[in-house]
């Protein structure tokens, strides 16, 4: 009979351990008040600045008429080939 009493106590102990461990984990995953609004606005601003820089660099390349392929000035060197 003693063995049958130990099994439910160990199960109850394990369940209580799991419940109490959730109390210790909750402070680490909490959300701070007000911080998310500032971070989202800052992120949006940085993304817009990056997008403007990309548009400017594309238009600069198109205006300068830089060829897409790199060519050597004298053509291929026949000695090396």
From Swiss-Prot:
Signal peptide: 1-31
Record's keyword annotation contains Glycoprotein: yes
Entry keyword set: Differentiation, Glycoprotein, Hydroxylation, Secreted, Signal
Biased composition, class Basic and acidic residues, residue ranges: 55-67
GO cellular component: extracellular region
Residues with PTM Hydroxyproline: 73, 76
UniProt-annotated glycosylation sites, renumbered to this chain: 76
Keyword Repeat part of the UniProt annotation: no
GO BP terms: cell differentiation
Region (Disordered): 55-81
Origin superkingdom: Eukaryota
Protein family (similarity comment): Belongs to the CLV3/ESR signal peptide family.
Protein name: CLAVATA3/ESR (CLE)-related protein 12
Source organism (scientific name): Medicago truncatula (Barrel medic)
Gene: CLE12
